[in-house]
A protein has these predicted regions:
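Peripheral, non-AAA+ core regions of ATP-driven protein-machinery
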Residues: 2-5, 9-12, 16-79, 86-94, ...
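Conserved RecA-like ASCE P-loop NTPase motor core of nucleic-acid helicases/translocases
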Residues: 119-123
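Conserved Walker A/P-loop ATP-binding site and its immediately adjacent core
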Residues: 124-130
Length: 457
């Protein structure tokens, strides 16, 4: 039986604590904590022990459950989520406004529905006519297996989900829903967590297993808004990353109980919706002849896949006291560090030069293995000497200018050889060069040695 207990709730943010205070510790507002009586659903450990029987077992005797995965028509989505949507799983998708969360989920709804799954799309932010207008634009022919419900009531959503016997449920977004049994305002931490708990219960019901995908808002710092508890509740956390001015969208799993984390799916935002990038090389690498300064190529690891990345740099004379350092694809601190190494270890004087770098396709530089390519592209622009477009650079560069080896260098070199590159500059490492018949591998000690070799002609 549920017990009653006294608590104090912030009427501004919904924070609950056992003792009164003048200031809410969560939102910082004064005089907002009010006393209320709430139900304590937790029972004593003695009562819990009567509800079910359980005992410790030997680990080697535990049987593995086989996850039933639901494949979509989007290989990039299935890759990011670990091979397909697990039937009794709860996933949350977060992204900045305008990144394409609702578009992606509507496209997935159509894909699953065409394969015979009953899909319930519950929106707490848009009307049914708004969803229909977008569906007509990006889906075209709408399957009879897609159900739409526009409501903020989790109680009503539960009724309709059960009535329509939905296999896959999409909630857009979880922060807009509420349960009638709680007095907290819509969007408060309590309502959000309890609505998420309701989704978990519906998904993992033994009588009818369902897959849930919830949308979660993202705050200004690029993290999912709300309590961390929400991330702990769900099985999978997906982040759709991309700037509104760029077409590129990266779908990354930051948590996955049913597969590897860090897997990445690549999409391009077009007028007809999100389009899979099937061949990343064509998307990220510009087709050009040798003879253009300021360009260098490397390979970067995103999840389990290797992506070619082209770095473009522009070095120009500055007539201001403080030269510009601009790097949309790279953190400014990292760019300044690499410029300092170039100046001190390679004799490339950039103290009065503007330096601008960019990765083609809008790809963000997340790996140190691209350091060498960035520095070579800057040197190429400064020296007004081009780099051969069949040459690649893979190495982390230390503060001493020394080239350091990068993880999985063998697989990177194999991929580059497959793509038709002829020469690769890397740090000193123990590899058998005979394994690469069509790729010349040049092991170098430091950045000065690389610059001397590349631009000696």
């Amino acid at each position: 039986m549920a017990k009653l207990k006294r608590a104090f709730e912030c009427k501004n943010c919904g924070h609950i604590q056992n003792v009164w205070a003048g200031q809410c510790p969560d939102c910082g507002k004064w005089g907002t904590l009010i006393e209320k009586t709430i139900k304590n659903e937790r029972t004593s450990s003695k009562e819990n022990s009567l509800d079910f029987e359980n005992e410790a077992r030997l680990l080697k005797e535990v049987k593995l459950d086989e996850f039933e995965r639901i494949k979509s028509s989007f290989d990039e989505f299935d890759r990011a989520i670990g091979g397909g949507l697990v039937r009794d799983s709860v996933s949350i998708l977060t992204a900045r406004p305008g990144a394409g969360k609702s578009t992606l989920l509507l496209q997935l709804s159509s894909s699953y529905a065409k394969d015979g799954f009953k899909v319930m799309y519950v929106s707490g932010e848009e009307s049914e006519s708004q969803i229909k207008a977008r569906a007509d634009r990006i889906i075209g022919e709408i399957s009879k297996n897609i159900w739409i419900l526009s409501t903020n009531s989790m109680d009503l959503a539960e009724i309709e989900i059960k009535k329509k016997d939905a296999d896959i449920v999409i909630l857009d977004s979880i922060q807009t829903f509420f349960l009638n049994e709680f007095d907290n305002k819509q969007g408060s931490p309590t309502q959000t967590i309890e609505c998420a708990n309701k989704c978990v219960d519906l998904a993992k019901n033994p009588e009818k297993k369902r897959a849930f995908i919830m949308v979660g808002h993202m705050n200004k710092s690029g993290e999912m808004a709300g309590l961390r508890t929400l991330e702990h509740l769900v099985d999978t956390v997906l982040v759709l990353d991309g700037e509104s001015e760029d077409d590129l969208r990266l779908l990354t799993s930051t948590k996955n109980r049913f597969g590897p984390t860090g897997e990445v799916g690549l999409f391009s935002m077009q007028e007809e919706g999100l389009i899979e990038i099937i061949n990343p090389s064509e998307y990220f690498i510009t087709e050009r002849d040798s003879g253009i300064e300021g360009s260098a190529i490397s390979v970067m690891k995103e999840g389990s896949r290797l992506l070619e990345i082209e770095i473009e740099s522009l070095v120009s004379k500055s007539f201001m006291p403080y030269p510009q350092r601009i790097g949309d694809s790279l953190r400014k601190d990292d760019l300044n560090t690499l410029i300092s190494i170039l100046q001190e270890r390679a004799g490339i004087n950039l103290f009065d030069e503007n330096v601008i770098i960019k990765a083609t396709g809008g790809l963000k530089i997340r790996e140190q293995s691209v350091n060498l390519a960035i520095m070579i592209s800057i040197a190429s622009s400064y020296l007004k000497k081009p780099v051969d477009n069949k040459t690649v650079f893979i190495a982390e560069v230390g503060l001493t200018g020394e080239l350091k080896k990068v993880p999985q260098i063998k697989s990177r070199l194999k991929e580059l050889e497959r793509l038709g590159y002829k020469k690769a500059y890397i740090g000193k490492c123990s590899i058998d060069k005979k394994e690469y018949k069509n790729l010349e591998i040049k092991e170098m000690k430091n950045i000065k040695e690389v610059i001397s070799d590349v631009f000696s002609k």
